[in-house]
Amino acid sequence: MLHPPSLAIGAILASITIIVVIFAMNGSLYEQELLIESAPKVEQMGPAKITMDTFVLNGSPILGDPNAPITLVEFGDYQCHYCNVFFQSIEKEIIKNYVETGKVKIIFKDYNIIGPDSINASHGAHCANEQELFWEYHDILYSKWTGENNGWASPTNLTMFAESIDADMDKWTECMNAKKYSKIIMDSNN
């Protein structure tokens, strides 16, 4: 049997709850309308114009004929698994069939998103680029890749990679120690 005072208290609480919910909903709808009406109008802008200068003025390395009619921009992180898959399975064919035939040039842009090893590897590649060995260093970095954030781009390994492509080690080491390309590397993500 139901206790009459309990039923009355329950009915009152239920009624109060329903009234509070209705007022809350009406109030929030009213506030949403106010927010929508008071939002400032923003002039729509198109996308920023991207030109070849966007890619080459910061010293991004170019592979192939600079006057090739097609430009392929490789955005890469030397620790990136999918970047490595691209290098291992597709890039060599693109180079063979399109870059070496003068149809395409490739521009490399650092896109370091994974970790400190990415930045260290990019420094190594830019320092190798001073000796016109960027693409050789790029290739060895991807060939020796062992995973993300596991230390494969340690100073010792990066030095061994530079030695293996016959870089002038005094110049390369001086460049690395000076972190000469830090700004270019960090700005590449913008």
Question: What does each model-found stretch correspond to?
Answer:
Residues 1-113, 183-190:
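Extracytoplasmic thiol/disulfide redox context detector
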Residues 3-18, 23-39, 111-190:
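Cysteine-centric redox/oxidoreductase cores and disulfide-bonded domains
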